[in-house]
C-alpha cells in the first residue's frame, strides 16, 4: 500500500523530521539528491552530460546537490540557476556555494547545446501560482531539449494537490519523488507530465498521518492478498460464501462473466449467475464452474425463480450490463422489493 499526500501533508511530514526528530534539512537534501542520481544512473547508465536547472527554493537545493554528485561520478555537468538570488533558501545557497567551490559552472541562461539528461529542479510541491513570463520561457526551453528528462520530486508546473497544470509544466520522462507519492502526480493531467514515477525513501515518515482518515492511499497487488480469505483444510466451497450475480442483458454476457469471475478470484465459494437466456451458451463456455440460471425477457413472468435465488445467496451483486430497458427496471425493482 502506498500513501498519497497533498502539498500541506508533505510539508508537515518534512517539518516533523526537521523540527521534532532533529534531522537537518541539508541531510534530507543530500539523501534526496543521492536517490535521484541512483535512479538517473539506473535509467541512463550511458549518460555522459547533464544539465540541471534549479530554482530558489529547496527543490533547487536538491538540484544543486544532484549536480555535485553527478560531477563526482564523472558526468559532465552544467547547472543553470533561474531563480531569484534574494529568494534563495539557506540550504539552496549552501549547495550553490559547495558546487562553485568544486568548479561546476553555474549559469543564469539555458545553454543552446544538447545534453544526455535534463534535470528539472525549478519548482517543488509548494507551487500554487500560474507560471508566466521568464519562468514559462524557461520551462518551454527545457521541454525543447532532446535529452532524457528527469524531475526532482515533482515536475515544475504541476499542482501537487490536484494535478492541474499551472500555466505550463516540465514534461518529464522520469520523476523521482521522495517519501510519498503526491496526489497531483497521479491525477491527470499532471500524471501525463510526470512520466515514470518512482518513490524513494529519504528518511521521512509520518506514522500519525498514515493512520489518519485524511490521507489517501492506493493498493498494490500484494496488498490485496491480505483481504483474501484463508482456506482451512477441513473446509469446502460452501464454507466461503454464496454470491448471486444478477448481470448481463441481451448481448452483455461479458459483464456477467467479469463480475462472476471477480467473485471467484476474490475468494467466493459458490457463484450463481442470473442472466438473460441469450447469454447461456457463452457463459457456460467461459465459466463452467459457475451455476447458471436464466430468464426469458419476453416471458410474461420472467423472474419466477428470483426469490429462491435471493434466499440462497449470502451476497447479491447486481447491475453489471443489465442496461436501462423496461425488463431491467422491473428486475431491479423486484430485487429491491424482495429484500426490503
Q: What name fits each language-model region?
A:
Residues 115-117, 122-214:
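Internal gly/pro-rich beta-alpha loop/helix module
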Residues 95-98, 166-170, 193-194, 288-293:
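Short, hinge-like loop/turn segments at secondary-structure boundaries
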Residues 112-116, 169, 310-311, 336:
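A short, aliphatic-rich alpha-helical micro-motif
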Residues 1-78, 185-340:
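Small-residue (G/A/S/T)-rich helix-start motifs and N-terminal tracts that mark the onset
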Residues 101-107, 132, 156-160, 224-229, ...:
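Short gly/ser/thr-rich secondary-structure transition/capping motifs
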Residues 105-107, 151, 177-178, 272-276:
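Short, hydrophobic beta-strand segments that form beta-sheet elements in well-ordered domains
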Residues 96, 118-123, 311-320:
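Small/polar-residue-rich loop-to-helix segments that shape phosphate-bearing ligand pockets
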Residues 37-122, 130-152, 331:
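Nucleotide and nucleotide-moiety/phosphate-recognizing core
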